[in-house]
Design a protein with these regions (language model features):
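Short beta-strand edge/turn micro-motifs at domain boundaries
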Residues: 2, 95, 118-155
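Acidic/histidine-enriched, glycine/proline-rich intrinsically disordered or flexible terminal extensions
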Residues: 147-180
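Short, low-complexity N-terminal intrinsically disordered segments enriched in polar/charged residues
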Residues: 1-33, 37-41
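Short, cysteine-centered beta-strand-loop-beta hairpins and adjacent loop/turn segments enriched
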Residues: 103-113, 144
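Short beta-strand or tight-loop elements
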Residues: 79-82, 117-121
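A solvent-exposed, acidic/Ser-Thr-rich amphipathic alpha-helical stretch
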Residues: 36-104
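Short, exposed interaction segments that mediate macromolecular assembly or regulatory contacts
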Residues: 99, 112-117
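Short aromatic-glycine motifs in intrinsically disordered, low-complexity regions
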Residues: 73, 110-114, 126
Length: 180
């Protein structure tokens, strides 16, 4: 029988990877709920974000995205990070390419529209004061698809389901409140 040993360095790197992944998840939840304060926790102070529609201070992006989404009629959205390649460039730095899929329902002059966007977040992460967060982000869009929405809020069994919201009235806030 062979025994396997894992070094403390390997354990520490695993913890670092998990901290980076957790940061990516905070970003997704923050942007989906249009929660600027939660969104800011994904970025170091002074970080930058280039999203095309916005290129500048990441904390300003966190304040910008809610009013911007409202101005284009966003009613619901889901950001997913499906997988991420994390390469450490030093003890406290990493570059991360994470694949993103976003689903958006928006109210337009022609009715509800559905968009799917596939892209990647190209991030420079840094660990400062023990916290892994984004220092710089570039969003790269690889493809998109736009079509009339077939969203059905009232039909069949949908009418009785709890509804997701893009604000702090979403059901998840009550569930997660003791932990935040």
């Amino acid at each position: 029988m062979t025994t396997m040993s894992v070094s403390q360095q390997e354990i520490d790197r695993f913890k670092d990877r998990q901290a980076i992944y957790d940061c990516l998840m905070r970003y997704c939840r923050g942007v989906d709920r249009l929660d600027a304060e939660l969104l800011k926790t994904a970025y170091h102070e002074g970080a930058t974000d280039d999203h095309g529609i916005f290129n500048g201070d990441a904390w300003e992006f966190a304040e910008f995205i809610g009013p911007f989404d409202a101005s284009i009629g966003v009613r619901q959205q889901t950001h997913r990070v499906d997988h991420a390649l994390i390469e450490f460039t030093g003890p406290d730095s990493a570059v991360v390419e994470s694949y993103n899929l976003t689903f958006i329902d928006a109210e337009t002059e022609d009715g509800m529209a559905a968009a799917m966007v596939g892209g990647r977040y190209l991030d420079c992460f840094e660990r400062r004061d023990g916290a892994w967060k984004i220092a710089h982000r570039l969003y790269v869009m690889d493809w998109n698809r736009n079509e009339p929405s077939t969203v059905d809020w009232e039909g069949s069994f949908f009418k009785d389901l709890a509804r997701g919201r893009i604000d702090d009235q979403d059901e998840s806030y009550a569930l997660l409140a003791p932990f935040t």
